[in-house]
């Protein structure tokens, strides 16, 4: 019989398997369990094939829990919602006071807070831990965002710091904060990811539809961008995608992929939280809307027929463009819009941190996103430095370095958006990011008229720019008295 293991992991889908193997490879003996026992056997076999790693499989929850040294630490990687509650119920029947459960899935933060409270009443510790990096990251080093019981974090800190992605500033993991902060931060990470991916897709559309770049040229362009300021995981994989030939037919695989984007819900949660917190996040919101519209494939096919019959083609005009100039303009537009997406995400995190008194460190979040995760990018180091310079920075756009870059790139950004509008190509991410930038940098907006309208029909009052206090005007009476 094997000696007690250091940790347990329940839930052996792709992420669970790979994280378990990563933990074992780092020298921590691990017990694994899955309700479908074939997954247990599959994981044990992989551990043997990948170097006789210290991984032990169990087919029933009681023997699984009893195989782990005390105080026990168990990571769950199961589907969010009811499956998490069911797994907790199964495991907690065999756990003892001081043991710890960690939810490593994409869970709604309030569910984590509810579960932490329920576990505390039983004498158990609980963490909600966002894990980013996909299957490759889980196996070789993810970015991890644990929040909840600090005592629970200390029980597993030695493992997490070894298992996480490693960058020049240390492991890509840190204790995020109290309650559901870890899950909340991971949710916003995913919202930023939505924005990032949408902006890249729009850059691709403009280059292909207006610039007429081939897949070979697109591969070269994105590979070149990945050697500069846009260096990131998403730009890297985009270059890779453009180079893959279709193994089931002629041409390139990307052109055969149905233009219908799926989603699992974290982007929607992010936009809902933006509304709840009254934080503008148009880049992220437009990326979600774009996914909704992509899902209307059949309707779009019919709409295209209707408008083509009326003379409105897919692309409105074949514009003659300087290809080299266009590529450089799109690069600058993508970078500037990307800054807006990250600024919106960070503002959401800060607003929630204030509301919940989490005291989150935005610079440290940028640091742990530098490696392992899907949004890892070179410029995250500069975001960290911006918050190091000013922890109370109200918006990334006004950091001295980032504001300078926005000023330098805004002309190219406007050219790209105008070009796309002229060609009838939708760029909701770039356009909404530009509108966000323009609204934020203007001292006075036309909101005065909107507030006057509200006071006219609803007596909602208004403030004046010259006299303090709340005012109401009988707009209707004044207007009609002049007739």
UniProtKB/Swiss-Prot annotation:
Binding sites annotated in the UniProt record for substrate: 106, 132-134, 189-190, 194, 264, 291, 454, 460
EC number: 1.1.1.44
Main localisation: cytoplasm
Active-site positions on this chain: 186, 193
Record field: catalytic activity: 6-phospho-D-gluconate + NADP(+) = D-ribulose 5-phosphate + CO2 + NADPH
GO terms assigned for molecular function: NADP binding; phosphogluconate dehydrogenase (decarboxylating) activity
Subcellular location: Cytoplasm
Keyword terms: Cytoplasm, Gluconate utilization, NADP, Oxidoreductase, Pentose shunt
Pathway entry: Carbohydrate degradation; pentose phosphate pathway; D-ribulose 5-phosphate from D-glucose 6-phosphate (oxidative stage): step 3/3
InterPro entries: 6-PGluconate_DH-like_C_sf, 6PGD_dom2, 6PGDH_C, 6PGDH_Gnd/GntZ, 6PGDH_NADP-bd, NAD(P)-bd_dom_sf, Pgluconate_DH
Residues the record lists as binding NADP(+): 11-16, 34-36, 78-80, 106
Biological process annotations from GO: D-gluconate metabolic process; pentose-phosphate shunt, oxidative branch
Any GO CC annotation of this UniProt entry: cytosol
Record-stated family: Belongs to the 6-phosphogluconate dehydrogenase family.
Subunit description: Homodimer.
Job description of the protein: Catalyzes the oxidative decarboxylation of 6-phosphogluconate to ribulose 5-phosphate and CO(2), with concomitant reduction of NADP to NADPH.
Protein name (database record): 6-phosphogluconate dehydrogenase, decarboxylating 1
Organism for this UniProt entry: Spinacia oleracea (Spinach)
Phylogenetic classification of the source organism: Eukaryota, Viridiplantae, Streptophyta, Embryophyta, Tracheophyta
Gene (UniProt): pgdC
């Amino acid at each position: 019989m094997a000696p007690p293991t250091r940790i347990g992991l329940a839930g052996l889908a792709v992420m669970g398997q790979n994280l378990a193997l990563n933990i074992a490879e780092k020298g921590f003996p691990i017990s694994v369990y899955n309700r479908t026992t074939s997954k247990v056997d599959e994981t044990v076999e992989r551990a043997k094939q990948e170097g006789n790693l210290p991984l032990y499989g169990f087919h029933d929850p009681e023997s699984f829990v009893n195989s782990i040294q005390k105080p026990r630490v168990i990571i769950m990687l199961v589907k969010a919602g009811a499956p998490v509650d069911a797994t907790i119920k199964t495991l907690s029947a065999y756990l003892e006071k001081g043991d710890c459960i960690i939810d490593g899935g994409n869970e709604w933060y309030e569910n984590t807070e509810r579960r932490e409270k329920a576990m505390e009443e039983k004498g158990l510790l609980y963490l909600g831990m966002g894990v980013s990096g996909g299957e490759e990251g889980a196996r070789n080093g993810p970015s991890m965002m644990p929040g909840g019981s600090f005592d629970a974090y200390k029980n597993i800190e030695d493992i997490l710091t070894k298992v996480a992605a490693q960058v020049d500033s240390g492991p890509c993991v840190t204790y995020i904060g109290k309650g559901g902060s870890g899950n909340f931060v991971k949710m916003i990470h995913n919202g930023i990811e939505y924005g990032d991916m949408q902006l890249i897709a729009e850059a691709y559309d403009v280059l292909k539809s207006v610039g007429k770049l081939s897949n070979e040229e697109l591969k070269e362009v994105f590979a070149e961008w990945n050697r500069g300021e846009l260096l990131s995981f998403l730009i890297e994989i985009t270059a890779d995608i453009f180079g893959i030939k279709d193994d089931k037919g002629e041409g390139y695989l990307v052109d055969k992929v149905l233009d219908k984007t799926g989603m699992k819900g974290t982007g929607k949660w992010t936009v809902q939280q933006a509304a709840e917190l009254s934080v503008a996040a148009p880049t992220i919101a437009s990326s979600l809307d774009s996914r909704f519209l992509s899902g209307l494939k059949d309707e779009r096919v019919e709409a295209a027929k209707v408008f083509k019959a009326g003379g409105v083609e897919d692309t409105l005009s074949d514009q003659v463009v300087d290809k080299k100039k266009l590529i450089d303009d799109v690069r600058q537009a993508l970078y500037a819009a990307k800054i807006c997406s990250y600024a919106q995400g960070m503002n959401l995190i800060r607003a929630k941190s204030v509301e919940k008194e989490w005291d989150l460190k935005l610079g440290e979040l940028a640091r742990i996103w530098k490696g392992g995760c899907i949004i890892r990018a070179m410029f995250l180091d500069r975001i960290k430095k911006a918050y190091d310079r000013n922890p109370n920075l109200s918006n990334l756009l006004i950091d001295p370095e980032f504001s300078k870059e926005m000023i330098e790139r805004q002309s190219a950004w406007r050219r790209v958006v105008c070009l796309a509008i002229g060609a009838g190509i939708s760029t909701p991410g770039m356009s909404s990011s530009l509108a966000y930038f323009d609204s934020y940098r203007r001292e006075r907006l036309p909101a005065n008229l909107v507030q006057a309208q509200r006071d006219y029909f609803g007596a909602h009052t208004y403030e004046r720019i010259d006299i303090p206090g709340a005012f109401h005007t009988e707009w209707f009476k004044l207007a009609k008295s002049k007739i």
